[in-house]
Amino acid sequence: VPTRNRYGILGPIPKPEMEPETLAKKLTSHPLASKAENQIPVTAVVTNSTYDGVCYNAVAAEDLLGQTVDTIHFDEAWYGYAKFNPMYAGKFGMHKDDRPAENRPTVITTHSTHKLLAALSQASMIHIKNGKRPLDHALFNESFMMHASTSPQYSIIASLDVSSKMMDMGGCGLMQE
């Protein structure tokens, strides 16, 4: 559970709250726990970076949470630029990771590309880095398509391509301006 400081800024989740023992206690004491078919959590969701700019050491969060869950979703709605500034190395879900996939959790990040990058309103991206329990691409795609519009706005999709190309070609320079 995130915290608020004296200025009302939300986050971060304290490190002890991510530890396996704490998560196990919270799960067993949850009012719906007795109705669950199994007590094994599937996914942890972490807002990284918050609206106020609070971000996590993603590697440390993965190491802690990965002891309890196989999948971590970093909601990085306001953080699509992190890869392009060395100051944020290791602090975003799609960070460079030399660990073998079987030794780390699967990481999903979502970026509301329209918020801080050059994409049209409502444009967003989902990124997946498979780990010890890879996502089934066909199942994921089927679920995604079930919730996507049958009448997509192609200008929004094109703006994602333009934004990606802009950042791919000059993102580091743009982040230093």
Can you say where each PLM-predicted feature lies in the sequence?
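Conserved PLP-enzyme active-site core in the AAT-like
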Residues: 1-177
